[in-house]
């Protein structure tokens, strides 16, 4: 099943500026592959700290694993998507 994942964080919660030792995820395509999720498309607006991805996964738990490094720092919305 396909999912749309949108995320937003504040400048203070940006991994680039946080300084808590948590490395930013700069390659979401590789992160998806690492956890067994197919990356379909993605992008973002860095100055606004917004990003999105379309992914395909057979298990919601994989999506939770995918986003785990940013949960608690980012607002993340995962929405199931089907063809219209």
Sequence positions of predicted segments:
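Conserved, structured core segments of small domains
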Residues: 1-84
């Amino acid at each position: 099943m396909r999912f749309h994942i949108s995320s937003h964080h504040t400048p203070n919660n940006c991994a680039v500026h946080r300084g808590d030792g948590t490395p930013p995820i700069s390659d979401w395509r590789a992160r998806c592959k690492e956890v067994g999720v197919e990356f379909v498309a993605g992008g973002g607006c860095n100055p606004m700290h917004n990003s999105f991805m379309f992914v395909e996964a057979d298990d919601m738990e994989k999506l939770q694993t995918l986003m785990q490094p940013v949960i608690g720092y980012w607002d993340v919305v995962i929405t199931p998507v089907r063809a219209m």
